[in-house]
Amino acid sequence: MEGRANSPGEPRAWPTRSVLCRGCVEPLVFLANFALVLQGPVTTQYLWHRFSADLGYNGTRHRDSCSNHSVDPIAQEVETLTSHWTLYMNVGGFLVGLFSSTLLGAWSDCVGRRPLLVLASLGLLLQTVLSIFVVQLHLHIGYLVLGRILCALLGDFSGLLAASFASVADVSSSRTRTIRMALLEACIGVAGMLASFIGGFLLQEQVYVNPFWLALAVLTVMTLYAAFCFGETVKERTPTRLFTLRHHRSVIQLYVTQAPEKSRKHLALYSLAIFVMITVHLGAQDILTLYELSAPLCWDSRLISYGSAAQQLPYLTSLLGLRLLQYCLADTWVAEIGLVFNILGMMVFAFATITPLMFTGYGLLFLSLVVTPIIRAKLSRLVRQSEQGALFSALACVNGLAMLMASGIFNSLYPATLNLMKGFPFLLAAGLLFIPAILMGILERDNHCPEFQEFSQSP
């Protein structure tokens, strides 16, 4: 890690910090996503019922009234307010996260992954505490935005993912990296399914604070694990200032430093492909709960929890599908198959007016998440071992930008098209997915130059 130290000569390494055990990073991702999925649909439903109460709208809708397709102007205003406040939270998180993710991710290349994991865990913990205050004390909704901003300042879930994926890249070989990344994403899915079922039962009586208390307990355990049990994967660590432009420069240099053209071209185009994938995934996720709450579906908390669990299931089925398909297909063609099923699922959502059709759409997404671990593994092979943190912090930035675009497009488009075609945002999502499909096909055709397949594992 030459050039990282503050003084010339051989860098001064930090002494190895004693930990209770040398735990892997997967439990952190599992616990973090468990807490987030537990809170996500609950926050949307809380906003819905909070605005319903403020506007005098009867939120307890019956099945027979849901079959009536006439538009209630008050219900439409509730949907619009819920969608817009979701947008405000995501925009606030992005604007702060754009600065903090790049700073903290590149910093972790020097000081190790643990400090970033601890900071991100504390940020998620703080956000949950503020959410509890809002629900318990009936505070202004703006405090939810404040919690989102404070969480982003400390790294947020995207920073935790950046450190986690970089940690996997630190210890995995080029051959096993794709499946290790998929395994990490599978932890996200299993945690999401479990949290969805538990969240549905906790919300039976619409006591919104209960899931937040459980999330607080989970995040407390996660923070302690990150601080005392995680086994550091960066072997040579050097004391480095946090607030310095060097960290941002190291991220920019990944894309602009003079290097063999093909390597940097692939870096940029794969980043674009994963940007579109995340935009579609997060955009659809943002409006699905709202789509299911309103007519003609009118799902209750139990059905929403089942739908949220089905939304997480592709993390697990994609891991199994990837493992099986790798025996007979190259990674790129596995990704193309996943994109086809993703497109089909979005098209079914667009025209779903009954519950069985919605679950058919969820079923078609069973291979939809093979794409992102494949792209992450390909990107990881394009940079040096000492640049893994910078790379995944750049991807965290891409994730934040995708979240902003997803919120801006889908949360604005959804209320705007309620009177025309309610499922139009899902049709747009299906169309956008052709972009990564085309990009990956082009890059695969041009991907046979051996010198860019793998850097040495040692710096």
UniProtKB/Swiss-Prot annotation:
InterPro entries, A to Z: MFS, MFS_dom, MFS_trans_sf, Sugar_transporter_CS
Modified positions (N-acetylmethionine) in chain numbering: 1
GO MF assignments: folic acid binding; folic acid transmembrane transporter activity; folic acid:proton symporter activity; heme transmembrane transporter activity; methotrexate transmembrane transporter activity; symporter activity; transmembrane transporter activity
SUPFAM superfamilies, alphabetized: MFS general substrate transporter (SSF103473)
GO biological process: folate import across plasma membrane; folic acid transport; heme transport; tetrahydrofolate biosynthetic process; transmembrane transport
Domain of life: Eukaryota
Organism whose genome encodes this protein: Bos taurus (Bovine)
Tissues and organs where the protein is expressed, per its UniProt entry: Expressed in retina and retinal pigment epithelium.
Entry's transmembrane regions: 26-44, 83-108, 113-135, 141-154, 178-203, 209-227, 267-289, 303-325, 332-351, 356-376, 389-414, 423-441
Signal peptide start-end: none
Keyword Cell cycle: no
Family: Belongs to the major facilitator superfamily. SLC46A family.
Subunit structure: Monomer.
Function summary: Proton-coupled folate symporter that mediates folate absorption using an H(+) gradient as a driving force. Involved in the intestinal absorption of folates at the brush-border membrane of the proximal jejunum, and the transport from blood to cerebrospinal fluid across the choroid plexus. Functions at acidic pH via alternate outward- and inward-open conformation states. Protonation of residues in the outward open state primes the protein for transport.
Glycosylation sites: 58, 68
Name of the protein in its database record: Proton-coupled folate transporter
